[in-house]
Amino acid sequence: MLPWKKHKFELLAEAPPRQASKPKGYAVSLHYSALSSLARACPEGALSRVGSMFRSKRKKLHITSEDPTYTVLYLGNATTIQARGDGCTDLAVGKIWSKSEAGRQGTKMKLTVSAQGIRMVHAEERALRRPGHLYLLHRVTYCVADARLPKVFAWVYRHELKHKAVMLRCHAVLVSKPEKAQAMALLLYQTSANALAEFKRLKRRDDARHQQQELVGAHTIPLVPLRKLLLHGPCCYKPPVERSRSAPKLGSITEDLLGEQQEEELQEEEEEHLEDCLEEEEEEDGVGDGDPAEEEAEAQRALVVAMQLECEDLLDPLENGHEEALGDGGVSLGPSSGTSLPLSVCASDMKAQLSQLISDLGDLSFGNDVSTLETDLRVTRLLSGESTGSESSIEGGGLDATPVSPGNPSGPADSTSLDEPYSG
């Protein structure tokens, strides 16, 4: 239709309405009426709800920080006979201190405290090719920041030799400040406690799973997902037995046919000899039979006497142990005593003491006061990674008045040939 002029205005034909273009891809188109209805229904939280529709979910992940590393001067080690207890390292630390000429001789090392244990590597660049040393956490029985020598940190390690032999050695290192030695001792104690608790938790979970498999069946209980194993990783507190030096080495079994035949012949001869002996005893019993009632009475009397003797043997150690435990209070458990405790009470007390002793075997004994060190600001700053003066808390600078002797570059490899080699 052609346009025409009227009263100086141009009137044009209306163009056909354009069709709305379809959304491309996965774009979401929201209508204005839907938004307006949502705003009218929820006037307060409309904007926040609309924004939450397009907001991505955020998660916070805690990245494991690196294990703290300290620059120390390794003084050496000495044998000891006490695995734990107050003052168990005094004599050994004294020997090490005198042997190192009051801390003037030693090897500069990098000491790292981790969930596996204490790892030491050489700090000098020329000695980096030498193998390091790893002291496994479950074999460390005692650690202390020495009170007589405040800058000395010592620990007792249970070395395992061949044929399941055990040797206790006390190791000592010298640091630059007393609070640094205290921080190292507290860190080792806390790491050991946490690792032991995690080891017990995983052990209880595995035991419960094995019990369920025995009751219900091995195929009905699902295995632990591989994702969970990779996420948590293996427990580092106690490595598998295969890594132990005292573990038996398994080899191939060679079958000997001649030896098997000889063993079978010997076994047959022993069985024949045993049958002949039994036949002879039966013949002798048949010849000398007496009154069966008298024999039965004698057997009953012998059984009663044997039971009395066994009961006395069992009661004697229980009574003696409880008398020693209650000796200070003046309570006697003998036959002439007027005061007596039931046997069940004694047995329960001994069982509780035994369970407590077993539970304490894996705990690391600490030679310092935990509460005092945890409230010390200098120690907590060192553990948190803050600097306390001219030297960094994690990567120490030099050692005050403790020069490294050039005549002893070997370090703990010469004196501690029993250490576990550090791999990696």
Swiss-Prot record:
State what protein this is by name. Answer: Protein FAM43A
Family, as annotated: Belongs to the FAM43 family.
- Which CDD domains does this entry report, sorted A to Z? PTB_FAM43A (cd01214)
Q: Which InterPro entries match?
A: Adapter_Engulfment-Domain, FAM43A/B_PTB, PH-like_dom_sf, PTB/PI_dom
Listed Acidic residues bias regions: 261-297
Source organism per entry reads Mus musculus (Mouse)
Pfam families the UniProt entry points to: PID_2 (PF14719)
SMART domains, alphabetically? PTB
Which regions are flagged for Low complexity bias? 382-394
The primary gene name is: Fam43a
